[in-house]
Amino acid sequence: MAAVGLQKTLGFEILPEVKPGEVEARFTVTEAVAQPYGYCSGGTMLALEETMAGAGSRRIAGEDAMPLGINVSANHVKAVPVGGLVTARATALRTGYRLHVWNVDLFDEAGDLVSTARVTNVIKRRKTAEEH
């Protein structure tokens, strides 16, 4: 799926699926997503974490699925400066019909953990043209 919306605006690259129940991504911290001190903003990291969980839920639940984030809880544990590369891995912890829970970890170029999040998505189904 092509990058759209927030994913495109912030420059997140969701990588092709390697393993079911896992999503990998990367992005370079730019001044556009930095806080005033020259480091990646926490809001940008939260956006990546929720975006990854949504992408993973969509892969699992199918094209008619609309994963909607209903809870995100994160701890940012290390700063990443402008120009730094962030890599990320999301792992599905539970993938029921209506509820998915993901763990998402972000890493800097040295492989150090910079943020960890738990994301819960509710899975809604898109209505078909006949259902409208």
Segments (PLM) and residue ranges:
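Terminal targeting signals and extreme-terminal segments of soluble enzymes
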Residues: 1-132
